[in-house]
Design a protein with these regions (language model features):
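C-terminal SET catalytic tail plus cysteine-rich post-SET Zn-binding segment of SAM-dependent SET-domain
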Residues: 50-145
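Catalytic cores of histone-lysine modification enzymes
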Residues: 1-58
Length: 145
């Protein structure tokens, strides 16, 4: 638990000067601090969502890492909750199969049930905490720390 599983390659920025190319899809993009958009690369592009994830993404010393939330068995699929650090408007139906599956997923952290928001607070990236400080303070009633 807490072990780094992999580093994420954020080298492919998507912007006006570097748009998505043929075969590249916006659903494979990740949205970061200050509105930066990156195209996820394999293998992290293939990490699926779960409402009961076994990992999360955190930036440490400038590098985004996939970090284990618990022991992950050999051969077990690595998953994370796409709503952690999320602030989008996308909604989709989830078929993750987890006992606590939320069925309808809103890509924004703030659409999560309050108990799950509170559970995920320690997992939030520093940039997300900074950009969403007011909303997080409102959630906890005392701030994010």
């Amino acid at each position: 638990m807490g072990e780094s599983i992999m580093e994420i390659d954020d080298s492919r920025t998507v912007d006006g000067a570097h748009p998505l190319g043929p075969g590249q899809e916006s659903r494979h993009c990740d949205y970061l601090a200050g509105g930066k958009v990156v195209l996820m690369r394999p293998p992290e592009r293939h990490i699926n969502h779960s409402c009961d994830p076994n990992s999360y993404v955190k930036t440490i010393s400038g590098q985004r890492l996939v970090i284990a939330l618990r022991d992950i068995a050999e051969g077990e699929e690595i998953t994370y909750d796409y709503c952690i650090n999320g602030d989008g408007a996308t909604v989709w139906l989830c078929n993750c199969g987890a006992a606590r599956c939320r069925r309808e997923i809103h890509s924004s952290f703030f659409h999560l049930p309050i108990d799950i928001q509170l559970e995920y607070l320690p997992l939030l990236d520093d940039w997300f905490r900074g950009e969403k400080a007011a909303e997080l303070k409102s959630l906890t009633g005392q701030g994010t720390g």
